[in-house]
Swiss-Prot record:
Keywords: Chaperone, Cytoplasm, Protein transport, Translocation, Transport. One of the proteins required for the normal export of preproteins out of the cell cytoplasm. It is a molecular chaperone that binds to a subset of precursor proteins, maintaining them in a translocation-competent state. It also specifically binds to its receptor SecA. InterPro entries: SecB, SecB-like_sf. It comes from Shewanella sp. (strain W3-18-1). The keyword RNA-binding does not apply. It comes from the Bacteria. Its main location: cytoplasm. GO terms for cellular component: cytoplasm. Belongs to the SecB family. This is Protein-export protein SecB. It is found in: Cytoplasm. One of its GO terms (biological process) is protein tetramerization. SUPFAM superfamilies: SecB-like (SSF54611). Homotetramer, a dimer of dimers. One homotetramer interacts with 1 SecA dimer.
Amino acid sequence: MAEVANNEQQAPQFNIQRVYTKDVSFETPNSPAVFQKEWNPEVKLDLDTRSAKLADDVYEVVLSLTVTAQNGGETAFLCEVQQAGIFSISGLTEPQLAHSLGAYCPNILFPYAREAVGSLVGRGTFPQLNLAPVNFDALFAQYVQQRQAAATAPAAEEANA
């Protein structure tokens, strides 16, 4: 009887329904003067992920990248890309689902976002920009660790009071 119950449990399923650009922005606030300066930029990458449940076993994951290039203390360009995907995910435990939404799906979306950023920077006539790979598994593990530390900190403070 237990074997029948185990066989009836849903096997893990993961499908990409759609990958799309949700929002994009490219600004060169100091053009054309920025093109006349020696190019020695400081490039900063900020990224964020968020997810939302759309229906049973259907989720949207959005990876947001903001790339800012400073050259000589001025903003050369600001590029923002929100790359999104709709994923069907079922048969996972809660921690597995959280990992899928927080690390696995962003890993799928990142190459698309990186290509969009590179294309926008090129269309702005700036030198080629190659974003380094991002370890979303490590970022997700760090996020989980920070949440656990934050959850135990108030309990520790109450115990010391």
